[in-house]
Design a protein with these regions (language model features):
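Conserved N-terminal alpha-helix of the aminotransferase class I/II PLP-enzyme fold
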Residues: 34-81, 88, 102, 110
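Conserved active-site segment immediately N-terminal to the catalytic lysine
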Residues: 171, 185-196, 205
Length: 361
């Protein structure tokens, strides 16, 4: 039977490199002569230990992660980190949050359970369509950290310049821009993200944390499983990890290295985004919703200005093999998530379809 792959613009779980999926399919029943699938393998086996260590090393190579940072492969996605971060870092019970979307807001609300969380900047006044000025923030003198969501999946905004945290630890949720471009890890105390947008299958988060932030000194009542030290000391093997997820992430890391690393990946991502934004800026029918200087190269929201026409577009696009273009339920309209694994041809096909739709409507 002839297989037909669609162009999948889902925000997550999202498109994975076809090459990676084919490799995984080939190894599904017999991983490198072991006679079993990685899914069936003991997480304590030599074979799995090699998968885990190789995945970590490849990630370190891609991001140039210094030796004084630990890489943790943790279950629970990004949501679990909303609580883990204050539980591990809120020594003074004070933290500052920059609210640029729904996920930063959820993390902020979670932190309020554990201490005094302050919203020191927000773009909610204009439906999170821009990144607030973060050059002179009212950072709390006793803040344990300053928190951002670096790329906003729902609203399509991105911090292109990191906030001035006035010497405080910067914590960043990079779920939807992870490995989309190079980043200087040393500017952060913690970088973390759910992997299901740009790296692998759902069910896991990667946490990159500076060693001095990993201590026994967590908030009273912190569950054992949510202590970073437990996972760091056990090399992400405190309990059975998401072993197949780690294997798939490892495959994606190798694929990214093969593409030329994150410098090359960034160039390709910018090229894809430019094709879509250039069309949106010249279109009579479609409009982008984000302030130009704050646009994400990963998530591109757009509207026609007519809800019925939006719905018609999404339906007809799906019939044309361009799927998951419906915007998040909180904002409506459309959104094209054009992660690393989205080929250039997919973005070109979307723009051609949009032009055709514009002519007919």
């Amino acid at each position: 039977m002839e297989m037909s792959r669609v162009y999948n613009f889902s925000a997550g779980p999202a498109v994975l490199p076809e090459e990676v999926l084919r490799e995984a399919a080939e190894e599904m029943l017999d991983y490198q002569g072991t006679g079993m699938s990685v899914m069936e393998m003991s997480h304590r086996s030599k074979a799995f230990e090699a998968i885990l260590n190789e995945a970590e090393q490849d990630l370190r190579d891609l991001l140039h992660i210094p030796d004084n940072y630990k890489v943790l492969f943790m279950q629970g996605g990004a949501h679990l980190q909303f609580a883990s971060i204050p539980m591990n870092l809120m020594k003074n019970r004070v933290a500052d949050y920059i609210i640029t979307g729904q996920w930063a807001k959820k993390a902020f609300k979670e932190a309020q359970i554990y201490g005094k969380a302050n919203a020191i900047a927000s773009s909610e006044d204009e439906t999170f369509s821009y990144i607030p000025d973060c050059s002179d923030l009212p950072v709390s003198p006793d803040a344990d950290y300053v928190y951002i969501c670096e790329n906003n999946t729902i609203y399509g905004t991105k911090f292109h310049t990191l906030p001035d945290t006035k010497g405080k630890i910067l914590v960043s949720d990079v779920s939807s821009c992870f490995l989309s471009e190079p980043m200087d890890v040393t500017k952060y105390g913690i970088i973390y993200g759910g992997v299901q947008k740009n790296i692998g299958p759902a069910g896991m988060a990667i946490v990159i944390i500076r060693e001095d932030l990993i201590t026994e000194d967590t908030l009273p009542g912190t569950p054992t499983y949510m202590k970073y030290k437990i996972h760091a000391d056990a090399n992400s093997l405190y309990n059975t990890p998401n072993s197949y997820g780690i294997y798939m992430c490892g495959k994606v890391f190798k694929w990214l290295k093969k593409q030329g690393g994150l410098e090359a990946v960034k160039v390709r991502n910018e090229e894809k985004a430019a094709i879509l934004y250039d069309y949106l800026d010249s279109s009579r029918l479609f409009k982008g919703t984000v302030r130009k200087e704050d646009r994400s190269i990963m998530n591109v929201p757009f509207v026609t200005g007519d809800k019925d026409l939006d719905a018609k577009f999404v339906k007809e696009a799906e019939a044309a093999g361009l799927v998951n273009l419906k915007g998040h339920r909180s904002v409506g309209g459309m959104r094209a998530s054009i992660y690393n694994a989205m080929p250039l041809e997919g973005v070109k096909a979307l723009v051609e379809f949009m032009k055709k739709f514009e002519e007919e409507n």
